[in-house]
């Protein structure tokens, strides 16, 4: 056993060494000197990612308009939270409000499960016909600690239900629900859980690959639309929860602007100084519209 383990370690070391050599001697010389991949490569990659040809210039302009629209909604919502408050000041008010705080991962799991169950119960028979198999979802605390939230679909026979997983950082013990109700709707119902579980349940109408296949543009597009839909249906009337929705949507719109603008070498927004994209302009967009710790932005 010891000999086999040592041989396996040596083999792995050799493979890593050969990979490093190939990257430095074969791949690195082919790399471009600029951060931008260029519009041709980006167009090809976006087609694979979204599933259709994207007019990148048009989408870039849409992203800038969407970012401005969301920022205006954030200002209006900040005024509802505390008259005269800026967006960041309103978020600080929400962070300090005990009404939006949960302590401990056990309480977080209960809150997540209750919100997901409530959404399915209230949507079923009113706005959606939720298949019986899809009416159950499990809220889980993930064994990892990177801070993300994600969804895993049910097994084909539903013996394993769909699950939302919350990856809680090691040092986190207090959670702010105003940011996260929209996440429950994104990952649960009417988001990914309704999306994938409904497809998997349609055994009589869809073959296996149509029930299980995933493309990011369709999959994430559904879940992002689900967040706005819940606002339209009145589930996000609370200004704190609506600010949470806007916070997440602002991040997505900012990424559209930054990613397309930088890689396709479009002119930077006027409020960022115009001209070519550079580190300072990318940082300005990120810092302004992505309310993440500085360590996550760098």
For each feature predicted by the language model, list its residue ranges.
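N-terminal maturation segment of proteins
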Residues: 1-290, 295
């Amino acid at each position: 056993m010891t000999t086999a383990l040592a041989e396996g370690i040596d083999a792995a070391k050799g493979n890593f060494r050969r990979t490093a050599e190939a990257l430095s001697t074969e791949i690195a010389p082919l790399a471009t000197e600029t951060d931008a991949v260029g519009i041709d490569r980006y167009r090809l990659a976006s087609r694979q990612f979204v599933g259709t040809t994207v007019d990148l210039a048009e989408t870039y302009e849409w992203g800038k308009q969407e970012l401005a629209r969301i920022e205006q909604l954030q200002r209006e919502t900040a005024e509802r939270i505390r008259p005269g408050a800026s967006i960041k000041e309103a978020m600080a008010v929400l962070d300090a409000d005990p009404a939006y705080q949960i302590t401990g991962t056990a309480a977080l799991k209960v809150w997540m499960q209750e919100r997901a169950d409530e959404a399915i119960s209230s949507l079923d028979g009113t706005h959606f016909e939720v298949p019986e198999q899809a009416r159950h979802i499990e809220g889980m605390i993930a064994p990892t600690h990177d801070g993300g939230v994600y969804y895993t679909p049910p097994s084909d026979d539903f013996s394993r239900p769909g699950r939302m997983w919350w990856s809680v950082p090691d040092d986190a013990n207090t959670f702010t629900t105003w940011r996260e109700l929209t996440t429950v709707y994104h990952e649960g119902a009417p988001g990914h859980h309704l999306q994938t579980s409904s497809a998997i349940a349609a055994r009589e109408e869809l073959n296996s690959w149509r029930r299980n296949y995933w493309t990011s543009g369709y999959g994430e597009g559904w879940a992002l639309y689900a967040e706005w839909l819940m606002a339209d249906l009145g589930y996000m009337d609370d200004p704190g929860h609506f600010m949470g929705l806007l916070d997440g949507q602002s991040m997505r719109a900012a990424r559209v602007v930054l990613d397309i603008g930088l890689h396709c070498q479009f002119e930077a927004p006027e409020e960022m100084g115009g001209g070519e994209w550079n580190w300072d302009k990318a940082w300005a967009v990120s810092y302004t519209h992505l309310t993440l710790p500085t360590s996550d932005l760098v």
